[in-house]
Amino acid sequence: MRNLDQFIGSQFTWFIGEVLDISDPLLSNRVKVMPYGFYDETIPKENLNWSTVMMPNTSSSYKGFGSNHELMVGSWVVGFFRDGPSAQDAIILGSIASTTDGTIDIPVEAQLNPPTNKVHKTEAGHIIEIDNTSG
């Protein structure tokens, strides 16, 4: 007989939160996130656990190969707790673009000719721009 109480995912607990820290001391692609609704917002970020960032299949995340996340402090993310309602072991699934402070969260360059202009912009201002017009 199966014991579903021990099955990871039997009590799926997801959240939306804000990234508060990206300086993972173990360099393991983790971030500290305030999962809104699970903790009082007055909790110091030092008391939050490090959350693992899930990477795409194009990043092997194995033995020094792959890539690192590009989340920034202030990014809004969606995640879930591997340990269910205990809410101590989080996995970050992705980020959510928003306009929380009145600024659109996609690069200005991408707004110029949507949907054919594909843009990747780093925090330092480096830009990779692709005109994806057919033909």
Roles of regions detected by a PLM:
Residues 1-135:
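Hydrophobic packing positions characteristic
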